[in-house]
């Protein structure tokens, strides 16, 4: 897959033209995009917001889980019950970028939103 033609949706600040990829398991970017649970996600989200504000050539790379982090409810005995809800990401824009990598000798498809 050739990513050379990918363009940021804003003009890059000439002071920050070095291309940078930020890898994280969590990104707290928006509540609707629930791919975070706490500190790591908020830190990564803050880095993304700062990079956007500075107009850096910067992308975040993480995993978009089908079921994401679970919600919780309380049982009658006050124990916690996990609730796995399939997440809806229809608000994300499809970039059309899709490619295959190999993990432990198995093909895994990667899609970019």
Annotate each predicted stretch with a short phrase.
Residues 1-113:
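Catalytic cores of carbohydrate-active enzymes across secretory and cytosolic contexts
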């Amino acid at each position: 897959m050739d990513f050379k033609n990918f363009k940021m949706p804003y003009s890059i600040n000439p002071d920050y033209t070095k291309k940078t990829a930020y890898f994280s398991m969590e990104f707290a970017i928006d509540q609707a995009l629930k791919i975070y649970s706490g500190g790591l996600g908020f830190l990564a989200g803050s880095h993304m917001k700062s990079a956007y504000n500075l107009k850096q050539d910067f992308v975040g790379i993480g995993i978009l889980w089908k079921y994401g982090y679970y919600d919780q409810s309380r049982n009658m005995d006050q124990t916690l019950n996990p609730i796995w809800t399939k997440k809806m990401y229809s608000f994300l824009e499809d970039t059309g970028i899709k490619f295959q990598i190999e993990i432990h000798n198995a093909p895994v498809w990667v899609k970019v939103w």
